[in-house]
Amino acid sequence: LENILVDNATLYEKKQGFMLKVLKDGRLLVVGNDSHGTAYGLMELSRLIGVSPWEWWADATPEKKTSFRLPTDYTDIQFPSVEYRGIFINDEDWGLMPWSSLTHEPWYKPGRIGPRTHERIFELLLRLRANTYWPAMHECTEPFFMTQGNREVARKYGIYIGSSHCEPMACSTPVEWKRRGKGDYDYVHNSKEVLHFWEQRVKETANQEIFYTIGMRGVHDGQMQGAKTVEEQKNVTEHVLKDQRELLRKYVNSDITAVPQVFIPYKEVLDIYHAGLQVPEDVTLMWCDDNYGYIRHFPTSEERARKGGNGIYYHISYWGRPHDYLWLGTFSPALLYQQMKEAYERGIQKIWILNVGDIKPAEYQTELFMDMAWNIGKVEKEGISNHLCHFLQREFGEEIGRELLPIM
């Protein structure tokens, strides 16, 4: 094994890589350069056999086979183009949350998306070669870290937990501030209580794999309280960043540069950033689309050179003004491909997060996004039409898949 790995040293060029190799004696070797890589390698073998990543979520029963063969000289080494790749469960009010808490794993009270559901979500993420998850956070839903068993199943599957642009420090602010907070969620007039609110979560999750969102907006997708002008908001945000990082340094790692952190200039926060906000060099800047698929800002040469790198938060599902798109997977795959290809080429390569709503019915767009995050050149090489055709044939069979392609 050691000689084989020496001969295939490219396996260790990046984290999360894997190798599938047929040995001279006919044995198949699956090797990962870390735990994630090993999982992705095993899932790749599953894909080769014909098992869909959506096997459970889409009732995609794999075709029965009596045998499966690989060439005697078969070697496949893969590793990700983007380091952190994941989804955001959002607008879960009518679909995922009631299905989870009332049907899939009924609780004594509704509102929980629990560990049994998350086990299925995290298995899907590994099958899609993803590793990051932003939990659902609407007021109807019990917070991820306040639901027994959730953090344990995230550790089991090796999933990094993050949070959206209005949930700093891994707190589901819309729900948790009403329970744990005191006074107004206002860093100008109530900073002591707000900081204590964040501190409680950081202390209890210090040993969890978390990609911390830092900064501050309003309680739920609105601008911050207490600061009226953009200049005031900029000054307050800089104080917030400093104080949040002190918490992370105190409880997570004294080397703050070793703690994954992301700042998300979403909606009005982009104006604050453009007003001259100073974001520490080691923090990842996560850019956003306009909620309809067009990225609002691509990193400059100075931003590309930052140690923290750049990320993207992208929507294929949205609830908000001027109109929603939630119930059908209507988002254009071609637009998704074009925007994400440009994002990667312009230096957005640290973290990609996709707002998938309830997961269903956007299976194809989700898989396209994750395939690009894993191998940015794969879709370009085969063409988006061929990529879609392969998806349809795998899910519905070759004949029906060909018939569906012109419809899709």
Where do the PLM segments sit?
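The substrate-binding groove and active-site-proximal loops of carbohydrate-active enzymes
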Residues: 29-32, 93-115, 131-141, 176-193, ...
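Substrate-binding groove of N-acetylhexosamine-processing glycoside hydrolases
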Residues: 73-77, 175-176, 216, 228, ...
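Trp/Phe/Arg-rich N-terminal binding region typifying the photolyase-homology
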Residues: 110-111, 115, 123, 135-150, ...
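Gly/Pro-rich turn-and-neighbor structural signature
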Residues: 61-70, 138, 145-146, 151-156, ...
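An acidic-aromatic substrate-binding cleft motif
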Residues: 52-111, 116-136, 308-311
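Hydrophobic or amphipathic alpha-helical targeting/insertion segments
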Residues: 25-61, 146-170, 175-203
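Loop/turn elements at helix/coil->beta-strand transitions in domains of secreted/extracellular proteins
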Residues: 82-85, 128-132, 157-160, 208-211, ...
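Contiguous, structured surface segment used for ligand recognition
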Residues: 1-79
